[in-house]
């Protein structure tokens, strides 16, 4: 049995401002001023609470984007109405500009409203929307320049900035912001902008686009969540396709990292049990059946591991300080048998990146766990024991398990199924009622409007509200002829229910272990742990239950 470590991320808005003549919160100025206009020092606000609050949101969004291939823009706040743009990406100065009036317009929405505005502008920058507007300005007299300066192009840029900016704000921890139409109305009102313009989408069109974009964003988040759940239960090849679907639409270090993790874990299924004595600290970044081996298993696993290395390199290219990718790269090299490179990436790259500003303290501990495995495999038992013991004092459950393996201590037995045990339910629904809602039904109930076809053979379905505080995700893999359906029924915020063994949200890890025994599979995160049992998953934050998931395959 292999254990995996998972870290936690997540994914994800604005709109353009408008004057009667010019409209944008994007790549085109919204007032009478042109991009690059220099403000006097008095017009730029700093060292005041509003600026500090907005700067904190900006910094979190930049960190969540994790793309440092381009210089990070400077964030400035302009006094009052500034240049009349509300929020603006100034490419000449490489500044994201937020005006005081725009800040005040989104006050009631807190940091989530600011993330909506600022995330929109950062998306213009990272998606290089400025190239088009710059081309139009320089070659506007040519036919191609005139064609590019079309309303449809502006709509496309603004819609993409809403969509990917929303994903960015979500990934930075600000949730799915659903007040965009209200906020844009307040911005228009604050600036006295008209609702119609020849050169920009109308206010009503803008609001309609926001609602549609929110729906698309929800689908993308749901696909990402499904990928994480599939990874947790070991459906790695299937999870890879879900991650790939997201990566085509949104690129980030976490997505590339998770693509690589899926390949590493799939490769681990190609090892014999005696080849994987220890548990490797592979880290899946969340925001969440090995069969018989043929003669080509060794070459297949090497191919998978080398594919994983390419994905980790892509994540590192976006953010050279992203410690989890270095650690996962080290794990891949260790599994390839290259202990020299594995030790270098764990001891030097992963550890140094993790300890820089103490951004990834858990990853630093996990690096020690991997080095301990390398020492043990090299016969340096005492050094391995010291590393595992030190990591155990830092509350590493994985280190404790590896220490037991090193000492030949018996591991806790897997929980036994108890005859007559009350079935697990969420919102009063048994998994049987979810997977077979009507006797002899071939497919669970789902919302057709939310169906996504990821490939010709893989579909994602869901029932968004089987009960008041739960959701259902269904993966339909037609290539799997024995168990094509994987069904997850999970709690959502506010669920007051209990499991069959009286465990509820907020209960501690010890209570779960007392009720269910030690999990046969655990997945570490920087803020907690995922405990995977035969038909139930517990997701912990700070050793407290944040949500649980019932699941089945059929």
Question: What residue spans do the PLM features occupy?
Answer:
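Residues that line or immediately flank small-molecule/substrate-binding pockets and catalytic motifs
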Residues: 8, 129-130, 552
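Short helix/turn-capping signatures at newly exposed starts of structured segments
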Residues: 413-554
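Positively charged n-region of N-terminal signal peptides that target proteins for export
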Residues: 1-5
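Bacterial N-terminal signal peptides
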Residues: 7-14
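Short, structurally constrained coil/turn elements
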Residues: 14, 69, 442-445
């Amino acid at each position: 049995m292999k254990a995996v470590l998972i870290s936690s991320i997540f994914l994800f808005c604005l709109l353009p401002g408008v004057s009667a003549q010019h409209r944008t919160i994007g790549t085109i100025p919204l007032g009478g001023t042109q991009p690059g206009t220099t403000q006097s020092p008095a017009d730029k606000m700093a060292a005041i609470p509003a600026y500090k609050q907005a700067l904190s949101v900006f910094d979190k969004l930049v960190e969540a984007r994790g793309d440092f291939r381009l210089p990070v823009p400077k964030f400035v706040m302009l006094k009052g109405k500034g240049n009349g743009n509300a929020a603006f990406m100034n490419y000449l100065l490489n500044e994201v500009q937020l005006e005081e009036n725009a800040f005040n317009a989104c006050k009631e929405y807190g940091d989530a409203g600011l993330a909506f505005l600022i995330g929109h502008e950062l998306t213009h920058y990272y998606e290089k929307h400025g190239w088009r507007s710059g081309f139009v300005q320089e070659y506007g007299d040519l036919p191609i320049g005139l064609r590019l300066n079309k309303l449809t192009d502006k709509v496309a840029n603004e819609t993409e900035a809403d969509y990917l900016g929303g994903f960015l704000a979500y990934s930075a921890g600000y949730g799915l912001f659903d007040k965009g139409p209200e906020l844009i109305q307040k911005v228009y009102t604050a600036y006295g902008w008209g609702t119609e313009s020849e050169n920009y989408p109308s206010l009503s069109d803008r609001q309609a686009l926001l609602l549609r974009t929110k729906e698309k964003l929800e689908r993308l988040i749901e696909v990402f969540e499904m990928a994480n759940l599939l990874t947790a239960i070991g459906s790695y090849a299937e999870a890879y396709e879900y991650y790939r679907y997201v990566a085509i639409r949104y690129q980030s270090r976490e997505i590339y990292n998770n693509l690589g993790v899926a390949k590493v874990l799939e490769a681990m299924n190609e090892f014999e049990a005696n080849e994987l004595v220890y548990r490797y600290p592979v880290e899946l970044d969340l925001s969440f059946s090995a069969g018989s081996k043929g003669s080509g298993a060794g070459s297949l696993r090497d191919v998978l591991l080398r594919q994983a290395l390419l994905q980790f390199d892509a994540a590192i290219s976006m953010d050279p300080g992203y410690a989890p990718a270095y650690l996962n790269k080290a794990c891949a090299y260790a599994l390839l048998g290259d202990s020299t490179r594995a030790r270098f990436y764990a001891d030097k790259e992963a550890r140094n990146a993790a300890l820089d500003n103490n951004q990834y303290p858990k990853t630093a501990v996990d690096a020690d766990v991997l080095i301990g495995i390398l020492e043990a495999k090299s016969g340096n038992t005492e050094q391995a024991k010291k590393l595992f013991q030190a990591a155990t004092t830092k509350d590493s459950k994985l280190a404790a398990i590896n220490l037991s393996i090193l000492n030949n201590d018996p591991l806790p037995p897997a929980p036994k199924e108890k005859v007559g045990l009350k079935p697990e339910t969420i919102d009063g629904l048994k998994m049987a009622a979810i997977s077979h809602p009507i006797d002899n039904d071939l497919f669970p109930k789902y919302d057709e409007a939310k169906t996504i076809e990821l490939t010709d053979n893989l579909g994602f379905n869901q029932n968004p509200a089987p009960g008041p505080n739960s959701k259902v995700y269904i993966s339909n893999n037609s290539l799997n002829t024995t168990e094509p359906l994987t069904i997850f029924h999970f709690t959502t915020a506010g669920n007051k229910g209990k499991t069959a063994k009286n465990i509820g949200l907020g209960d501690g890890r010890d209570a779960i272990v007392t009720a269910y025994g030690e999990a046969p599979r655990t997945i570490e995160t920087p803020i907690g742990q995922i405990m995977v049992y035969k038909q139930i998953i517990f997701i912990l934050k700070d050793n407290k239950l944040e949500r649980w998931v019932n699941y089945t395959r059929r």
